[in-house]
Amino acid sequence: MVSFGIDLVEVSRIRRLLERRGERALVRLFSPSEIEYALRARPPLSYQRLAARFAAKEAFIKALGRPVPFREMEVVSKGKQPYLRWRGNDCPLSLSHTGDFAIALVMIPEELIPPRTGP
């Protein structure tokens, strides 16, 4: 069985985080290529791109059902299609952003879902 995760992020939340913590927050949450891609655009698009990637990582954690350090995940593109890469595996991903919201939906294939333990 596959697992799906979805997350919605306010772009202003990411903007405020970066205004307060700057580069420290960027390198803690995003890979160098994610940062480079986002910062190729000027605000507000750069904030929207980062918010979408943040939402993708949150959606992945929800779908997986356990915490994962943000730096272990990376949003990558194959052509125009984004994927969330984790441990060398690419999970299908859909991203969208507009105004003050970014949303992500990720699908984790069955073989990547850890077995449940306990009752």
Residue positions per predicted region:
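Core catalytic alpha/beta fold that binds nucleotide/phospho-ligands
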Residues: 1-119
